Amino acid sequence: MEQQTRFRHLKMQIQRKLNACLQKSEQFFDRTFAVPTVSYEVRGIKAGVAYLQKNAIKFNRTLLLENPSEFVNQVVPHELAHLIVYQLFGRVKPHGKEWQAVMTNVFQLPAETYHQFDVKSVQGKTFAYRCGCRIHQLSVRRHNKIQRERAVYLCQYCKGRLEPVNKICP
């Protein structure tokens, strides 16, 4: 199937999934929710982004085309859950207990915070950094922040400071 036609079909699947998840949410909470606007402008490694105050969701077209089934079934409810939580509770932790409850109790899905898609095609240039336990690949933006001394990044596992792999030690 031609890519443009395939993309059109996937957009329809996303709209159907959004509508189904909205309907589940409205039945579960016994109230209506505003239908979000949807676009496909996200770039980089993010699969989707929810804009809470705009009631909008932006999806990554490339990751959608490369992972259609998982994208429709996991990413769409994930981003919609952020909007549902915002409409119910206002500003709370992005993947906090309210969001987790919507994912598990309303959508009957695991409350996974990150996708597992192969991001090689969308990743862009990376820079190798090391901590006490492993090598990390940082984006150009994070690398530049470190170089300009505007940010320090710590490993999520060992809490060690990330240092450039090619840094010359005194």
Curated annotation (Swiss-Prot):
Its cofactor is Zn(2+). GO terms for cellular component: cytoplasm. Keywords: Cytoplasm, Metal-binding, Zinc. One of its GO terms (molecular function) is zinc ion binding. It comes from the Bacteria. Pfam families: SprT-like (PF10263), Zn_ribbon_SprT (PF17283). Zn(2+) binds at residues 78, 82. Binds 1 zinc ion. The keyword Zinc applies. It is found in: Cytoplasm. GO terms for biological process: response to stress. Belongs to the SprT family. This is Protein SprT. The gene is sprT.
